[in-house]
């Protein structure tokens, strides 16, 4: 006779899994769009591409996680924004190629299904999808006892977007003389957290450091990653942007050259970079070399645009936010990024 409790005895709570699905339905519903087909719970998420109205559609996809920022979410028991981070990391990558996000899928793996906690995680994913204009059409929650501790979980996601073939941004339009415009980040975003955790390993998170302008350390460290989709899409539609760089792991040094050809370089005026207080604190308390900061973090600029000089004012007008004119594209001599 089959022991009905055998799976539970191995550490997998099927009923908790069902509860998670029921809890997240209302959050998923917030993200629905015209192209969504079918209901949550099928074997595959479906999306009707014809609803986009794109004449020559090119699908552009991206996948990412949030790295060890998750460890701080677990440490501080705050799980309602980490999902936004996951969405942001994916959709900001595909917007850099000119894609409008269509849909998103998430993957959560945990040592023990805790429905209330996982609902918070997925609620954050849904909020990120709303901000990005993407539908959350599927996902997976895997309970894996023995692989993860009971309080641990991992989170990853996958975004798919669409671009008109003629509006793909691949760096081929970036030329010498283009102006580099920086869009502000919301904070550290989701990269460099192994170093961040080392720097603040002995802190509780409740500290209000003088550099942080009255905010608790844990609030600043868990500030969700900014999603740039709605700000940048109008620029893409008007074909005002030649190149876009999402400043993630590797900071300026690794990411900026990804948006132009090998014979070009980015010359950046450091005095124009809106360095956020958290980066000053990290440099100070971590005793990190100043030049290395630009090799690791976004330093206050989460997205960089290469724009023809004659389009700069129109771009600023459409963005309707603080835009930082931080440099220009030059002919490459030695380095791909020159910070002065």
Curated annotation (Swiss-Prot):
Native species: Streptococcus pneumoniae (strain P1031)
GO molecular function ontology, one term from the record: phosphoribosylamine-glycine ligase activity
Family named by the database record: Belongs to the AIR synthase family.
Principal subcellular localisation of the protein: cytoplasm
Pfam families: AIRS, AIRS_C
Pathway: Purine metabolism; IMP biosynthesis via de novo pathway; 5-amino-1-(5-phospho-D-ribosyl)imidazole from N(2)-formyl-N(1)-(5-phospho-D-ribosyl)glycinamide: step 2/2
Stored InterPro entries: PurM-like_C_dom, PurM-like_C_sf, PurM-like_N, PurM-like_N_sf, PurM_cligase
Protein's name according to its UniProt entry: Phosphoribosylformylglycinamidine cyclo-ligase
Localization (cell): Cytoplasm
Sorted UniProt keywords: ATP-binding, Cytoplasm, Ligase, Nucleotide-binding, Purine biosynthesis
EC numbers: 6.3.3.1
GO CC term (a single one): cytosol
Catalytic activity: 2-formamido-N(1)-(5-O-phospho-beta-D-ribosyl)acetamidine + ATP = 5-amino-1-(5-phospho-beta-D-ribosyl)imidazole + ADP + phosphate + H(+)
GO biological process annotation, one example: adenine biosynthetic process
């Amino acid at each position: 006779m089959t022991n009905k409790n055998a799976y539970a005895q191995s550490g997998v709570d099927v009923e908790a899994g069902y509860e998670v699905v029921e809890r997240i339905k209302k959050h998923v519903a917030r993200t629905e769009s015209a192209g969504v087909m079918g209901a949550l719970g099928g074997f595959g998420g479906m999306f009707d591409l014809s609803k986009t109205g794109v004449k020559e559609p090119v699908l552009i996809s991206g996948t990412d996680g949030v790295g060890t920022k998750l460890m701080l979410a677990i440490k501080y028991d705050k799980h309602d924004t980490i999902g936004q981070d996951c969405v942001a990391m994916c959709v900001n990558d595909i917007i850099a190629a000119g894609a409008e996000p269509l849909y998103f899928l998430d993957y959560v793996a945990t040592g023990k299904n805790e429905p209330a906690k996982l609902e918070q995680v997925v609620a954050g994913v849904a909020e990120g999808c709303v901000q990005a204009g993407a539908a959350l059409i599927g996902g997976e929650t895997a309970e894996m006892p023995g692989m993860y501790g009971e309080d641990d979980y991992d989170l990853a996601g996958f975004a798919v977007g669409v671009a008109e073939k003629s509006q793909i941004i691949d760096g081929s339009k970036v030329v010498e003389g283009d102006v580099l415009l920086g869009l502000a980040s919301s904070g550290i975003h989701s990269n460099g957290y192994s170093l961040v955790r080392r720097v603040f390993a002995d802190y509780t998170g409740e500290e209000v450091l003088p550099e942080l302008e009255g905010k608790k350390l844990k609030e600043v460290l868990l500030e969700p990653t900014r999603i740039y989709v709605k700000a940048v899409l109008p620029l893409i539609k008007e074909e005002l942007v030649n190149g876009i760089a999402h400043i993630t792991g590797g900071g300026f040094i690794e990411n900026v050259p990804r948006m132009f050809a090998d014979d070009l370089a980015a010359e950046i005026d450091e005095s124009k970079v809106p360095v956020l207080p958290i980066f000053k604190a990290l440099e100070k308390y971590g005793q990190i070399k100043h030049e290395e900061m630009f090799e690791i973090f976004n330093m206050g600029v989460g997205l960089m645009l290469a724009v023809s000089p004659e389009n700069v004012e129109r771009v600023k007008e459409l963005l309707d936010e603080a835009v930082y004119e931080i440099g220009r594209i030059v002919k490459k001599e030695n380095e791909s990024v020159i910070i002065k």
